[in-house]
């Protein structure tokens, strides 16, 4: 055992042992409690960054701790391998996306191995492998057969740079989430999965996720956006269809002075066909920003279509406007405008000098309608037969009236829209459908799956290369045998990441999407990833899990029992990025200090949920601590080996009750730290685990070894310390555990048990304050009387109370504090 800590040698030795023993390969064991720990699998960009290091170390620490508790632990890893960056690299560098992706995976896998993460590599999944996406295609066909998949023309979010459709969730402040380009509105034929059919369950089952952050659950509630309201029907002059309007405030119906439709509403297009100015307005809105945050602040613009609707109660005509603040994907793409009682409608009415009709009277307050809209509830006025009703009552009465007259109905509305999964790109899972002029849409037969991406394609940077590949497109219809075309769209990459966690459980299964192993391992017990996935990946995965449950593939209702959302890694107060020049290279960090130092720092520097501020001095401090632990262990190696031999031979018994007081006191501290650290591990508070380990080490390194019992105490304490540190710094703990003669490998050692008798103590440390200021400390017996404690306090604080009158002595038992009040 070298005197000097050499992390590279230590880490290579530990990793070779784990590889040789296949330490982290796991199988199902019904006699053990299972624990499935999973960090969101990475996109193979080519290199790990410090955010990766933090995220995957968090998962590894949890997995190793749960294993030490005796559970059957699965921690797999894989690659979310499809996506635009690979295709963009193909365009830029003239390299096939598959080749670029495989090269990146190899580089990142090497980095993961150097970090020492306890992965079951035999379960490694790469989503661009046909054996993976084959089952995604198979499942999509099952959903199609159930009526949960459909294709229709829809106005979509079009990214003009990436030349593809984006889901609503992929539009951030009006821009594409990857390219940053301003998103345009475009009508295109798209594939959808009916996530709205599961909206109620997706909402209600959030209540069962007790171990999810409240913020994430609220974000999903808001995104699903359930509201109870009324659908109102407006007949339109010289137009064949009624306009359907959804509102949560039917009590304001009598105050409607105009209607507004979205720029891509069929009525707007009808109006534009006969009105040049309307068409010009629609053209000017083509690049409209569609994020709700943008809508709240952008200029409200519109134009009168010249068409009118009939008020369903009064029969009066209302003008119909096209407005840029109405979105087709929310509600029906049309709104009832009540300027007196909706601020947005009021602003629009002021701009275009439209009527403002008050129909709600505020209760006990005055309101100036020349300044703003009154948006709260009140008493109805100017509402004919509904006058004098409270808003709460009027909502029901007016809804009933509309239902009786076939002019509306009570309804539940959702903000959530069906999931558009079509992407007009090459590097994704081919959608397994065939379009035949004779038969329409025909699924690819199961025996012809997977539909594999062709390799003989050209990457021009515009549109989908698949549309230009005749060998791929031109097929025979499996139903009628006539010439047909293969679907050239590929899946949104969120489809692959919506079920990968279940496939990890039964990697290698060639005859089914999932098998009974998925039922054993799911749900994932601990999932780790960023909060930015709250309304994309996490919602889609919950939806997919319910789809798989209803297909009989899994038993549970939810995919992830507990969720940990880690904070970002910052440097100089900013997120690390190449453009800011504040990136820390994990390879350099590991080469300089070792993986254990990197792991220790990212666990110690901040609680997991909070942002971590990078600190070079913090890294050096973590490294110094590990060097001290190594040096101490080396210094006492022979003694510790002898004690181990005694214990293994059955001669290592110590009666701790008979030990001297200083040993009892130190042992009390060690087991206090053990109890607290175990509690902190259970709460994922790893920063306080590390601080506890540092306190424990300081306690034993300062301890004077004088008796045989002292040696056993040091042995017991170093055993506890190494096991507490092992999930966080596994390499150094593995080597020290072996070199100090402990039984088995530390990866197989049980979690240390708290000796409750050690937590009991005969003595208590007290602090003495004089007029609230700390002046002294002393130790007293646990059964000392108040008089004895006060006398001891006066004695130890003598220099501060001499020549003063002690007016009062206050003992605070639970804080071990005595305050002397002097005059």
Curated annotation (Swiss-Prot):
It is found in: Cytoplasm. A motif ('KMSKS' region) lies at residues 575-579. InterPro entries: aa-tRNA-synth_I_CS, aa-tRNA-synth_Ia, Leu-tRNA-ligase, Leu_tRNA-synth_edit, M/V/L/I-tRNA-synth_anticd-bd, Methionyl/Leucyl_tRNA_Synth, Rossmann-like_a/b/a_fold, tRNAsynth_Ia_anticodon-bd. One of its GO terms (molecular function) is ATP binding. ATP binds at residue 578. Its EC number is 6.1.1.4. Pfam families: Anticodon_1, tRNA-synt_1, tRNA-synt_1_2, tRNA-synt_1g. Disulfide bonds: none annotated. Keywords: Aminoacyl-tRNA synthetase, ATP-binding, Cytoplasm, Ligase, Nucleotide-binding, Protein biosynthesis. PROSITE patterns: AA_TRNA_LIGASE_I. GO terms for cellular component: cytosol. It catalyses: tRNA(Leu) + L-leucine + ATP = L-leucyl-tRNA(Leu) + AMP + diphosphate. GO terms for biological process: leucyl-tRNA aminoacylation. CDD domains: Anticodon_Ia_Leu_BEm, LeuRS_core. A motif ('HIGH' region) lies at residues 42-52. Belongs to the class-I aminoacyl-tRNA synthetase family. This is Leucine--tRNA ligase.
